[in-house]
């Protein structure tokens, strides 16, 4: 990417914002080397990485990057055979622990393929960390127990030091006290000494190690402890040698993990960089741009990331319906800001950064981005000479190769307007032929006409409010800019006579074009008002529709709840009836064990008839259901009318007039219920109501009960796989149904197996009064796996 472009568009300031959000020096190095990529897949990967980091922070998950150090120098020194000091080793241990914590955090996340892949490069280093922490404490000092030898040496040193202190304490408190400057013991050159007044040098035999700045005090090692000091010095040398040996061993362990440590540092740098990108995206309220392979740029509500305070967002595009955009308008109206925003957005997107813009923003991957904006100054200063502009444009034309975005500020300015406009049109035409996407700002009215007469060239302008005499900073695509000089002068107080006279100096063509442009601006302003009103009305209509849908949904839910409640009540009644019937049957079974077989069969038949009647009260027949579906929505219902309850699929009679809420009381069999008119249909008179003519219908059904039962019932029951108790219960019910169905004989399949089930069935049949006889199955009947029972008539 062109270095001058990066400098002019202030890409370095974006990198500074990124660097402020890194947690390690490793991450900052990645930021410093950041440059826009020109490979589509690489840009896509960078954007996805930023989105993953942003999602973590959006979810309240901060990436744990604390405790990580740049160990590259430490590792290199260890690899060369150098010895790391305890502080360096402590950095290694801290980084190992932090790497492990970071790895675990990323592995626990879902939907982050790029960051998860980076986490696989992070080492754990359990053994290395344990070895270092066993030898080095949290203050960066080698522990006494780092080795048995070191522990013994330091123990001996403490004993010797205590003995020396005791002897020196006795010395300074004894007869020699009067010779001392102060009654203290201090250390010089690693040896214990006492401060002796210089005039008493001869009275204190010993070795002089130092003298005070004033010369009045000598620091003397008394002869009584010289030997002990010598012993202490020897122990100190041994301590140093043992510490060096320990540090060398730990350094060799670091060297052994060199490759893994360097891979970890590389992953840490990239993760820290991704974290910074995610933070910046959140802080600037950015969105991930949609990447496209075509060299286009489409910005929705884009905000220049370096501008402070309230920024008016811009909407602009190029490369879709046109390839050259000519922006006109007043100074300080935002033309240069628009140029810089477009260029910087492309650089940021190709560097993998999200953009401070709205959803729908699309960016293609440009191989080159060129700018000619002022004298490479900031947004607030964009003036330059004609020669400076032209020199840079020549450089751009010479370097132009692949798909490029070219941004030209005040094209052709700084020279004769006629020649400058001609040059500007020629340059734009040349760039268009070379396939570049070009955005140029200008004051020349000739370029407005040029844009209207060329294909894939479009006008744009920055809006100016003549009422307030201030620019609005809005960029209007398709509308050429107007100087507004006459109107502004009039509003500022210039004599109308002078303004009118000035208009006379314009050529007829110039005046016609200026009037046309002002008319376009007026029409656009009116259309903007109408569009705003239409948007307001559409929003109001949408709100009303949502309110209606909400109320309709509430009504639907209430109706469904009512239907469900009624259905539950019906099911409860049916369940109660079934329980009562089963209770009667159970009682009859118990009683009939002591009664004659005929009486027992009659009681069972009676009980099942009761069950059938209860079922018919709440469950309509198939014929009734078909009849009910022929009903119509009722009008003018009155008590006694026959109706169908749609939600329950049952019929009944109206018992009351509709109330204020449109509900009536309906009798359906044994069930009385309040039903909405919207849930009713008028039933035909031929269609029997639930509970109406019940006995007759029961008799009609009863006539064919045995025949129907016999026709539908299987003459065999399969007990295989059942426990004995469960099997006997099924046999008992099966025999009841078989007797009711009038079956002459039945087959009971129990399988061969161990024979336990067959024995239990045989024993039950032996004592059952419904069974006349029984036998094992014959050839073709299942053999010993089947028992055939003949029932009493």
Curated annotation (Swiss-Prot):
Q: Name one GO molecular function term.
A: ATP binding
Question: EC number(s) on record?
Answer: 3.1.-.-, 3.6.4.-
Q: Which UniProt keywords apply?
A: ATP-binding, DNA-binding, Endonuclease, Hydrolase, Nuclease, Nucleotide-binding, RNA-binding, rRNA-binding
Enzyme category, top tier = hydrolase
Biased region (Basic and acidic residues) positions are: 623-639
Q: Does the keyword Nucleotide-binding apply?
A: yes
GO BP terms, alphabetized: mismatch repair; negative regulation of DNA recombination; rescue of stalled ribosome
Q: Where is this region: Disordered?
A: 611-639
Tree of life domain: Bacteria
Boundaries of every Smr domain copy: 717-792
Q: Binding of ATP: at which residues?
A: 329-336
Quaternary structure and partners: Homodimer. Binds to stalled ribosomes, contacting rRNA.
Q: Which family does it belong to?
A: Belongs to the DNA mismatch repair MutS family. MutS2 subfamily.
**NCBIfam families under this entry?**
mutS2
Put simply, this protein is called Endonuclease MutS2
Give the organism the record lists. Symbiobacterium thermophilum (strain DSM 24528 / JCM 14929 / IAM 14863 / T)
């Amino acid at each position: 990417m062109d270095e001058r472009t990066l400098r002019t568009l202030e890409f370095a300031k974006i990198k500074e914002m990124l660097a402020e959000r890194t947690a390690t020096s490793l991450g900052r190095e990645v930021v410093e080397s950041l440059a826009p990529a020109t490979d589509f897949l690489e840009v896509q990967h960078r954007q996805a990485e930023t989105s993953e980091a942003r999602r973590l922070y959006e979810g309240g998950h901060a990436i744990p990057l604390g405790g990580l150090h740049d160990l590259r120098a430490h590792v290199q020194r260890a690899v060369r055979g150098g010895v790391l000091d305890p502080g360096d080793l402590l950095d290694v241990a801290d980084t190992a622990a932090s790497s492990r914590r970071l790895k675990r955090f990323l592995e626990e996340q879902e939907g982050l393929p790029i960051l998860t892949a980076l986490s696989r490069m992070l080492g754990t280093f359990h053994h290395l960390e344990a070895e270092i922490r066993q030898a080095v404490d949290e203050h960066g000092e080698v522990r006494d127990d780092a080795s048995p030898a070191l522990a013994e040496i330091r123990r001996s040193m403490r004993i010797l030091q205590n003995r020396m202190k005791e002897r020196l304490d006795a010395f300074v408190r004894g007869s020699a006290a009067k010779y001392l400057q102060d009654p203290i013991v201090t250390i010089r050159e690693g040896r214990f000494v006492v401060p002796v007044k210089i005039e008493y040098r001869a009275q204190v035999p010993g070795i002089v190690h130092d003298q005070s700045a004033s010369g009045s005090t000598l620091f003397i090692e008394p002869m009584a402890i010289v030997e002990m000091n010598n012993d202490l010095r020897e122990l100190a040398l041994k301590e140093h040698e043992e510490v060096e040996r320990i540090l060398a061993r730990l350094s060799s362990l670091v060297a052994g993990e060199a490759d893994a440590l360097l891979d970890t540092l590389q992953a840490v740098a990239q993760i820290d960089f991704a974290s910074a990108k995610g933070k910046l995206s959140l802080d600037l309220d950015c969105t991930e741009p949609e990447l496209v392979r075509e060299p286009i740029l489409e910005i929705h509500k884009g905000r220049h990331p370096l501008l402070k305070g309230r920024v008016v967002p811009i909407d602009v595009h190029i490369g879709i319906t046109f390839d050259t955009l000519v922006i006109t308008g007043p100074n300080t109206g935002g033309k240069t800001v628009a140029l810089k925003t477009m260029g910087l957005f492309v650089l940021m997107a190709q560097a993998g950064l999200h953009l401070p813009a709205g959803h729908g923003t699309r960016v293609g991957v440009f191989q080159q981005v060129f700018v000619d904006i002022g004298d490479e100054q900031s947004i607030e200063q964009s003036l330059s000479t004609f020669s400076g502009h032209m020199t840079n444009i020549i450089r751009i034309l010479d370097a132009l190769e692949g798909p490029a975005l070219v941004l030209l500020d005040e094209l052709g300015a700084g020279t004769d307007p006629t020649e400058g406009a001609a040059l500007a049109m020629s340059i734009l035409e040349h760039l268009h032929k070379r396939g570049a996407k070009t955005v140029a700002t200008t004051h020349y009215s000739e370029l407005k006409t040029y844009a209207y007469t060329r294909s894939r060239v479009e006008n744009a302008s920055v809006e100016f409010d003549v009422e307030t005499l201030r620019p609005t900073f809005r960029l209007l695509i398709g509308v050429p800019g107007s100087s507004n000089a006459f109107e502004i002068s009039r509003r500022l107080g210039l004599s109308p006579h002078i303004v009118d006279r000035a208009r006379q100096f314009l050529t007829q063509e110039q005046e016609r074009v200026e009037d046309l442009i002002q008319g376009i601006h007026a029409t656009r302003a009116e259309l903007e008002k109408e569009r705003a009103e239409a948007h307001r009305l559409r929003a109001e209509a949408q709100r009303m529709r949502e309110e209606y849908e909400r109320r309709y949904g509430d009504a639907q839910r209430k109706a469904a709840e009512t239907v469900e409640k009624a259905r539950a009540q019906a099911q409860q009644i049916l369940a109660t009836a079934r329980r009562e019937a089963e209770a009667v049957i159970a009682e009859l079974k118990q009683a009939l064990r002591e009664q004659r077989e005929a009486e027992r069969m009659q009681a069972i038949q009676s009980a099942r008839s009761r069950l059938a009647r209860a079922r018919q009260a709440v469950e309509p027949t198939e014929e009734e259901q078909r009849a009910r579906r022929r009903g119509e929505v009722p009008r003018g219902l009155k008590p006694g009318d026959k109706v169908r309850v749609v939600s329950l699929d049952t019929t009944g009679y109206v018992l009351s007039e509709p109330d204020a809420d449109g509900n009536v009381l309906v009798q359906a069999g044994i069930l009385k219920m309040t039903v909405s008119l919207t849930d009713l249909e008028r039933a035909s008179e031929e269609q029997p109501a639930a509970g109406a003519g019940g006995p007759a219908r029961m008799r009609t059904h009863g006539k064919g009960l045995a025949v129907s039962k016999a026709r539908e019932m299987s003459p065999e029951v399969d007990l295989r796989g059942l426990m004995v108790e469960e099997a006997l219960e099924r046999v008992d019910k099966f025999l009841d149904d078989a007797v009711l169905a009038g079956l002459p004989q039945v087959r009971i399949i129990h399988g061969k197996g161990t024979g336990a089930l067959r024995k239990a069935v045989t024993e039950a049949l032996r004592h059952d009064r419904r069974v006349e006889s029984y036998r094992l199955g014959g050839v073709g009947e299942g053999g010993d796996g089947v028992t055939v029972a003949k029932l009493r008539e």
